[in-house]
Regions:
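Amphipathic alpha-helical protein-protein interaction segments
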Residues: 13-16, 60-64, 82-86
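Intrinsically disordered, low-complexity regions
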Residues: 5-7, 28, 49, 54, ...
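Amphipathic alpha-helical binding modules
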Residues: 73-110
Length: 110
């Protein structure tokens, strides 16, 4: 059996608002590129970014906890006009953050 991947901790937030702007723009671009550009993609990216920023401002640095918070709060979002759902959004945020840190999404190695 493979060894479990250790938890991934983000560096402490020095500018959560700036991180949020980056995440919002990057997630919106990812959503538009993954399937079709849709008007709702901007709303999805804004909401996920809002949750992320709030969590970071509260001191959350654990990637798994951030993803669960986004997943949980995105369950209340109306995805009826989108190809996506809360799981796809939470996973995309995780992938984008891992990419930004230079961490291999497959195996957790830098």
């Amino acid at each position: 059996m493979a060894d479990p991947i250790p938890p991934i901790t983000l560096p402490p937030a020095t500018s959560p608002e700036q991180e949020g702007l980056w995440l919002q723009a990057t997630l919106h671009q990812w959503l538009d590129n993954e399937f079709l550009p849709e008007a709702v993609n901007g709303d999805i990216a804004a909401r996920a970014s809002q949750v992320f920023v709030r969590q970071r401002m509260e001191g959350e640095n654990d990637l798994g906890s951030l993803v669960i918070a986004i997943l949980t709060e995105m369950q209340g979002f109306d995805f009826s006009q989108s190809f996506y759902g809360e799981f796809a959004i939470a996973n995309a945020v995780s992938d984008l953050l891992l990419d930004s840190l230079g961490i291999d999404r497959c195996c957790g190695a830098s």
